Regions:
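Residue-level marker of regulatory loop/turn positions in helix-turn-helix DNA-binding domains and
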Residues: 7-8, 18, 59, 97, ...
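Short, charged phosphate-coordinating catalytic segments
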Residues: 19-41
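Short, leucine-enriched amphipathic alpha-helices that occur as contiguous helical runs
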Residues: 11-13, 98, 102, 123-124, ...
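Short, polar N-cap/turn motifs at the start of nucleic acid-interacting alpha helices
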Residues: 37-39, 135-154
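Basic, alpha-helical nucleic-acid-contacting "clamp/cap" segments
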Residues: 40-41, 49-90
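Basic, Lys/Arg- and aromatic-enriched nucleic-acid-binding interface segment
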Residues: 1-26
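C-terminal catalytic core of tyrosine-transesterase DNA break-rejoin enzymes
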Residues: 17, 21, 123-145
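DNA/chromatin major-groove-contacting recognition/catalytic segments
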Residues: 141, 153-177
């Protein structure tokens, strides 16, 4: 996502990128702390997720550069709150709420003409892409699912019957049937 300060700020860009890079759940992103950040490894470590699982939240180099920029802004503005995402309210910086995170992502959706755009929309999309390019196991690993059954049932876009038929025709032709 390119810089456009008129429509969104660095925390918007970081939220979008982290959801896209990691396919993390909102509860994980919401709970990120500065102390969990490992810039050398491009991840947040020991993040509590759904059902108490501890996971790593990965990110890539573009996001790493945004994080460095955000850390400088935090230092300049003397933001000492332990949470990575913060809002300024009533004269102090506080942990950004899940609702604020949802609203920020929804705002990005409106910019690109998608009305029902939420953090989970990004999660489902990237899991679908990875599962289609790689395989269902890759999608399950990215999603931090216990097994690929959950990924298959709830995250993977199901193919249309015509697509399945065409794929079977191709496979049969390759097999000489």
């Amino acid at each position: 996502m390119k810089k456009n300060k008129k429509n969104y700020d660095i925390q918007d860009r970081l939220l979008f990128n982290l959801f896209l890079d990691s396919a993390a759940r909102i509860s994980a992103i919401y709970s990120l702390k500065i102390s969990q950040l490992n810039l050398d490894e491009n991840l947040f470590e020991n993040v509590r997720e759904k059902e108490g699982y501890i996971v790593s939240i990965i990110f890539f180099n573009e996001t790493k550069e945004l994080i460095k920029e955000w850390l400088k802004i935090r230092e300049t503005n003397k933001i000492t709150n332990e949470f990575f995402f913060v809002t300024y309210y009533d004269g102090t910086y506080k942990q950004m709420t899940k609702e604020t995170i949802r609203n920020r992502i929804k705002k990005i959706g409106k910019i690109i003409n998608i009305d029902d755009f939420y953090p989970h929309s990004i999660r489902k999309t990237i899991i679908n892409i990875i599962s289609n390019i790689g395989n269902i196991t890759d999608g399950a690993i990215l999603a931090n699912h216990k097994n690929s059954k959950v990924t298959s049932e709830h995250y993977i876009k199901h193919q249309k019957q015509n697509d399945i038929k065409n794929r079977l025709i191709d496979l049969r032709a390759k097999a000489g049937l």
